[in-house]
Amino acid sequence: TPEYFTLSFIGDCTLAPHQNTQDYFNKVGDDYAYPFANTVQYFADDEYTFANLECTFSDRSLSPVGYPTFYFRAPTSYVNILLEGGVDFVTTANNHLNDFGDKGAEDTYATLDNAGLPYGKVGQAQVVTTKNGIKIGVYCGFNINDGYFVPTTDECVNAINQMKADGAEYIVMAFHWGKELYYKPTQKMIDLAQACIDAGADLIYGTHPHVLGP
């Protein structure tokens, strides 16, 4: 294990096109390197880069499920944006994975599998290996606006113990949580994070609020 190494963490990546950004798409075309052109140098030089994939990948004409205010679907070719950008792992544990129901989620997983891009699902404990052979445990969970958290605290602690047993040298807990536009963590977030750290997690990777937090 190196004396020190760098992990990079990207926030919510919504790759789906929007009418207000159509001019950019018309100009950029299929230049998948464009979105991360100014940051790829950092991600290429680090040990491992994580991102939250806040959209579905599908080429099917699917209808939104439920009544989301926003729903995001990107063509499957847009997975190349992540690959060209130096992303090594994405979490899909968020409130937009199921914007287009089970079929949208299935297409998303298939797209990531075909691209060879590792990903995490809700409640999935796994150990990934970085380019220099470091074993990092990753566990993903989420809630919406500080509501019911999936998985539970006990399940998070059990997952940490399992990842240790599976050889993880460092453990990252990737949580899509909290309230949008709130700068400070809620007490629920603090309590869960502390329980995870006490159990042996090394880092809490939080996404969702759309603002920087402590």
Kindly give the residue locations of the regions a language model identified.
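Acidic, metal/ion-coordinating pockets
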Residues: 1-214
